[in-house]
């Protein structure tokens, strides 16, 4: 429940309020209205809902439909002239975040907040942190792969970072479930569209940066992408940063007056004696660690999570146990065929993460390598060139290009775009299950490997704007072992 006076106070304090327009009359103050719910979905309103008219695709007919369900008030950046009062604001997304925060009782003040950003590794790092903090605390987690608000039930999120109303609703549920910490993945999109506006994190972690999410409906340039990633540093009380990432010098200057830990080859917090399933650390995490996720980049994610959790009350023993216990669905899952050949299933879905995945596999598997890969339709278009240029440097890999959430595009047209940057022959098979079957058929020795990249644990294909059923890469591969 929230009073209209409270709504207006919040908006005025942040410089967001313009006026209320009611039947052509302008008001600066208003009283005697109470809202029992808030919503940005016009299908989920009642007469006591405060509705937020947001989004580039918002249409007046959504409002008209909501009014037929009894809607009496809305917030917008303009007057849609639909016969009910409107609170006009300068920025609807900022307004929605601040009002949601208050409506749900400021749950951020009752939890320790840990956020991860980076082009890749956010989910893995979040899982490490969740397992570490679970040793001695009661964490909740908002993750692309799995979200849990009670530590017992898990569900998949539609967005890396939820819309602000959903975010504060979930944070409030975590508080009601007696959680002590909240671990989040924070995307650049979350800052671009202000889903976390007004939030300050106890610890913010920057894992890495490489060009991604650049396209017509995402970021217009790398500069814009990197800028929105860096906003997490501004909004965190303490920060953890990978000193080996590109453009580290900018971040180092940006956070010099904040509490911080740097990890990587330039500082005390380093990885030593890196092996497939173990490593040693120096600095604040000095000691020996067991790890189930192979690859140096996963060890880096573990160190980042460990340093963050150390600041949030975890002991070194908690960190060791948590890292050793961590597995992530669809992240470096390994199957073995009857003939001994390995199958690696991973969510790698941009050029940089695919490069690291290939390097890890080729370190351990020295025989024939087959790769099953697609690229998403209608988003991240720059990935296609990145994939093609990378694979052009690996003529030893037999590439099978296929569908990966083609959406409104033709998967074979996407495959053609990727292959236009590759100077050696590749296979193109539209059906992803058939592509996996074909790749596994050519690997028949214990040193051979199939890499199935892109979808990870996703059990759907996005086709024509809808999630169509798909068994999942692991289930498909298991059929052909």
UniProtKB/Swiss-Prot annotation:
Gene Ontology cellular component terms for the protein in this record: cytoplasm
Presence of keyword Cell division: yes
Reaction(s) catalysed by this chain's protein: UDP-N-acetyl-alpha-D-muramoyl-L-alanyl-D-glutamate + L-lysine + ATP = UDP-N-acetyl-alpha-D-muramoyl-L-alanyl-gamma-D-glutamyl-L-lysine + ADP + phosphate + H(+)
InterPro entries listed in its UniProt record: Mur-like_cat_sf (IPR036565), Mur_ligase_C (IPR004101), Mur_ligase_C_dom_sf (IPR036615), Mur_ligase_cen (IPR013221), MurE/MurF_N (IPR035911), UDP-N-AcMur-Glu-dNH2Pim_ligase (IPR005761)
Compartment(s) of residence: Cytoplasm
Residues bound to UDP-N-acetyl-alpha-D-muramoyl-L-alanyl-D-glutamate: 42, 160-161, 187, 195
Modified residues (N6-carboxylysine): 229
The enzyme's E.C. designation: 6.3.2.7
Top-level class of the enzyme under EC nomenclature: ligase
PTM (free text): Carboxylation is probably crucial for Mg(2+) binding and, consequently, for the gamma-phosphate positioning of ATP.
GO biological process: cell division; cell wall organization; peptidoglycan biosynthetic process; regulation of cell shape
Similarity section: Belongs to the MurCDEF family. MurE subfamily.
Record-given protein name: UDP-N-acetylmuramoyl-L-alanyl-D-glutamate--L-lysine ligase
Species name: Streptococcus pneumoniae serotype 4 (strain ATCC BAA-334 / TIGR4)
Name of the gene encoding the protein in the UniProt record: murE
């Amino acid at each position: 429940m929230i009073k209209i006076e409270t709504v207006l106070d919040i908006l005025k304090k942040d410089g967001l309020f313009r006026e209320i327009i009611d039947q052509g009359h302008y008001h600066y103050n208003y009283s005697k209205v109470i809202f029992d719910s808030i919503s940005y979905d016009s299908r989920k309103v009642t007469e006591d809902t405060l509705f937020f008219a947001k989004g580039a695709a918002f249409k007046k007919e959504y409002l008209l439909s909501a009014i037929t369900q009894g809607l009496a008030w809305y917030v917008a950046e303009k007057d849609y002239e639909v016969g009910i009062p409107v609170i006009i604001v300068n920025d609807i997304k900022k307004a929605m975040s601040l009002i949601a925060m208050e409506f749900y009782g400021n749950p951020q003040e009752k939890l320790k907040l840990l956020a991860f950003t980076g082009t890749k590794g956010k989910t893995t790092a979040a899982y490490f942190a969740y397992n570490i903090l679970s040793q001695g605390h009661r964490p909740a987690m908002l993750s692309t792969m799995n979200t849990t608000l009670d530590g017992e039930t898990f569900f998949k999120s539609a967005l890396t970072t939820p819309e602000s109303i959903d975010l504060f609703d979930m944070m409030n549920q975590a508080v009601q479930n007696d959680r002590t910490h909240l671990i989040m993945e924070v995307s650049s999109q979350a800052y671009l569209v202000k889903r976390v506006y007004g939030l300050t994190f106890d610890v913010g972690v920057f894992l890495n940066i490489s060009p991604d999410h650049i396209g017509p409906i995402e970021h217009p340039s790398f500069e814009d992408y990197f800028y929105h990633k860096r906003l997490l540093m501004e909004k965190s009380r303490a920060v953890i940063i990978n000193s080996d990432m590109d453009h580290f010098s900018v971040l180092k200057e940006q956070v010099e007056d904040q509490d911080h830990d740097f990890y990587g080859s330039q500082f005390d917090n380093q990885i030593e004696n890196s092996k497939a399933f173990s490593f040693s650390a120096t600095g604040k995490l000095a000691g020996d660690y067991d790890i189930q996720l192979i690859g140096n980049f996963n060890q880096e994610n573990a160190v980042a999570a460990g340093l963050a959790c150390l600041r949030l009350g975890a002991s070194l023993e908690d960190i060791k146990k948590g890292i050793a216990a961590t597995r992530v669905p669809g992240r470096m899952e390994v199957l073995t065929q009857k003939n001994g050949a390995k199958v690696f299933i991973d969510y790698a879905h941009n050029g940089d993460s695919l490069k690291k995945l290939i390097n890890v596999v080729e370190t351990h598997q020295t025989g024939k390598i087959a790769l099953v890969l697609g690229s998403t339709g209608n988003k991240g278009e720059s990935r296609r060139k990145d994939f093609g240029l990378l694979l052009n440097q690996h003529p030893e890999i037999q590439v099978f290009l296929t569908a990966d959430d083609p959406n409104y595009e033709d998967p074979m047209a996407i495959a053609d775009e990727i292959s236009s940057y590759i100077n050696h022959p590749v296979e193109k098979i539209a059906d992803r299950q058939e592509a996996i079957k074909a790749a596994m058929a050519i690997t028949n020795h214990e040193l051979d490997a199939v890499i199935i990249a892109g979808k990870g644990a996703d059990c759907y294909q996005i086709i024509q704007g809808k999630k169509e059923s798909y068994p999942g890469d692991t289930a498909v591969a298991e059929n052909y072992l």
